[in-house]
Amino acid sequence: MSVTTMEVSTESDPGHPLNGLSLKQRSARAGDRSPGFDATAARRFLDLLQTPRTGCVEMRVLRAAVDRQGWVRRGDDIGGGFGGSTIAGWFDDGQRLIDEARRLRGVSGYVTFNPARSDLLARSDNRLTRARHTTRDDDVLCLRWLYLDIDPLRPAEISSTETELRAAIARRDAILGDHPEFAASGAWGCSGNGAWILVRLADYPNDSQHAALLVEALAALDQQYSDNIVRIDTATANPARLIGLPGTLKAKGCNRPDRPWRRVTLEGSGTQQFDRLQSG
């Protein structure tokens, strides 16, 4: 896997535009020159989420603000002591979502992977705005995906090292190898700091019985594949869960050479439905 990193040095240039900025502000500006937005990956992913076309998708950016040029950045990098707020929009037009994702600079972009009720379009119709409310679990129309978030263990709010990232990707590939039905019915990629798998379900009803099946499946996978290096997140079963949008940047902490910001990727997908989740 090719990983793009970036190092910024300003010590020998008093007039450099990054001088006088905080470390976080430097990281935000550095994010402008980190791996760019991959619209093709975003489009492929959105097509997977919305086949068949059902409801809408929420896109969300956390602790963010819009600068004077219209870019969406970290709130604490805009200045004025503002820590940022939740910015969100609901989309039934994939191209409009991609157009909004192009505005992100040094912030992570997330989407809901299960279809949400179309009524939510009335909050922010195919555009990003400051949001007081976001998609709730009971706004989800059906359980379309089982989400495996495979992350290397590390301190909170920092990006992974290359070694940590490779460990997570190797664990993902082991899961796909042990469960070929996941590869046949799922999609997978790199989350920027770890790896992910989405397993396509048969649009289960969004009820407690079927939600419990997802919880049990994640617990079983966690028991089999988690250790003191990589873990399977068991908290991803809630219907309104978010996933990093492929093609966008995962920007945790500061953009350092040893823990760089990286792009979320979509590396493969199958075409079948997995319909064998059973209790016990």
Regions found by a protein language model. Give the residues of each.
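A common structural junction motif
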Residues: L218-I229
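Catalytic "initiation/cleavage/transfer" segments centered on a nucleophilic residue
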Residues: N228-G280
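N-terminal compositionally biased, intrinsically disordered segments and leader/signal-like regions
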Residues: T5-M6, E11, L266, Q272
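Signature for HUH/AEP ssDNA processing cores
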Residues: M6-T10, H16, L21-N193, R200-A220
